[in-house]
Regions:
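A positional "C-terminalness" feature that preferentially activates on distal terminal regions of long
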Residues: 1-211
């Protein structure tokens, strides 16, 4: 039930968890009512009837205002003078169908995993994302058994258009102890950190032995 967003696994690393808390306009009023009704009584009693306050919120806030709960809290405070602490919002009490569902699919459209949490999906599908990025890489991008800097400039970002999607990956120089390799990763920070270690290994491999 509710709304599902279909995400190709190769694009999972590019989807930011921003804006999905607002859901779609058709369900937003119901979501706002549910949020207000889920407040602890000491706060909820200030916003009765909840549907009326939801009506007012629908007219005065939008996704351009940032995070949904921040926008709702700020607007309700302006309307009533009541400050709602962040931890007063009981998201667990909101019906499941009022939370965005994320479905990650493979190249054949088969659902690999689905969850209401994007971060859980990213953590659980790291291996599948990595494999998918390797499959779309052009020949020569990923290399192994390198002992010299024979691959030119290593770009910070690799972009490829596939099936109408712009797939982004981040080349990293990986330390393999006796050599280095170039791998495409889904995380730019991880790629930078590992590349520093890979660069160190490559330098050590090219220092002449004192013996």
């Amino acid at each position: 039930d509710g709304v599902s967003l279909i995400i190709p696994v190769a694009l999972l690393n590019q989807v930011e968890d921003q804006g999905f808390d607002w859901l779609i306009p058709a369900l937003r009023h119901e979501l706002l009512v549910a949020l207000i009704k889920a407040l602890p009584k000491q706060y909820r009693r200030n916003f009765v009837p909840a549907p009326n306050y939801a009506d007012a919120l629908m007219q005065t806030i939008s996704p351009q205002d940032g995070k949904l709960l921040d926008a709702v809290s700020n607007r309700l405070k302006r309307m009533s003078g009541v400050t709602i602490p962040e931890d007063a919002w009981e998201l667990s009490s909101v019906p499941v169908h009022l939370k965005m569902n994320f479905k990650v699919v493979d190249d054949n459209g088969k659902v690999l995993q689905q969850s209401r949490s994007l971060s859980i999906l990213k953590q659980g599908l790291q291996g599948e994302v990595q494999q998918s990025l390797s499959q779309v890489a052009e020949q020569g991008i990923e290399q192994e058994q390198l002992t010299q800097w024979s691959f030119g400039t290593l770009p910070r970002e690799y972009v490829k258009l596939q099936a109408g999607y712009e797939i982004k990956a981040f080349p990293a120089l990986i330390d393999d102890k006796h050599s280095v390799s170039i791998k495409l990763l889904d995380n730019p920070e991880q790629a930078r950190a590992l590349s520093l270690l890979g660069l160190r290994r490559l330098l050590l491999l090219n220092i002449p032995s004192p013996v």
